[in-house]
Curated annotation (Swiss-Prot):
Keyword Zinc-finger among record annotations: no
Molecular-function annotations in GO: RNA binding
Name of this protein: Transcription antitermination protein NusB
Assigned keywords, A-Z: RNA-binding, Transcription, Transcription antitermination, Transcription regulation
Lineage: Bacteria, Bacillati, Bacillota, Clostridia, Eubacteriales
Family (UniProt): Belongs to the NusB family.
Gene Ontology cellular component terms for the protein in this record: cytosol
Keyword Mitochondrion attached: no
Domain of life: Bacteria
NCBIfam families referenced in this protein's UniProt entry, alphabetically: nusB
Function field: Involved in transcription antitermination. Required for transcription of ribosomal RNA (rRNA) genes. Binds specifically to the boxA antiterminator sequence of the ribosomal RNA (rrn) operons.
Any one GO BP annotation for this protein: DNA-templated transcription termination
One Pfam family linked to the record: NusB
Length: 153
């Protein structure tokens, strides 16, 4: 299983958690179970990808309030709770990766989120997701630059 597939599974779990109130461990287990074949035997790479999916789900869910604040800040004219649930899950996962995952470049997090939006949401969602995430990144870099300027004084 690739990281892309792990993100798809994480998206399914986050969507289920948001809509049905399922706990993170159950949602991930159900997403992984749906994905497996009867003769499936996890190898090392597959277990690493499954763990990546678990980490994304737990992290995105744990930090959803922080992510929602960032999303709301840059989603002009949109309230997070009024967004399509799948878009909200994609954005939460991507913001979590951008803010908290040092092993994932911002550009990869955005590209993967855009691909998820193209696959699982509406025709306009990929542009919507791309625009919000780009603004989040620019806002964070601007804040980091301001912090550096203040600390040098």
């Amino acid at each position: 299983m690739s990281r892309r597939k792990a993100r798809e599974l994480a998206l399914q779990a986050l969507f289920q958690m948001d809509i049905a109130g399922t706990d993170p461990d159950t949602a991930v287990a159900q997403a992984l179970t749906r994905e497996t074949e009867p003769d499936w035997a996890p190898d090392r790479l597959e277990e690493e990808s499954a763990e990546f999916a678990r980490r994304l789900v737990r992290g995105a869910w744990q930090h959803r309030e922080e992510s929602d604040r960032l999303i709301a800040q840059y989603a002009r004219g949109w309230r997070v709770e009024r967004m399509a649930a799948v878009d909200r899950a994609i954005l939460r996962m991507a913001v979590y990766e951008i803010v908290h995952s040092e092993d994932v470049p911002d550009s990869v997090a955005v590209a993967e989120a855009v691909e998820l939006a193209k696959t699982f949401s509406t025709a306009d969602s990929s542009r919507f997701v791309n625009g919000i995430l780009g603004s989040v990144i620019r806002g964070m870099k601007g804040a980091a630059g301001a912090d550096e300027a203040v600390s040098r004084d």
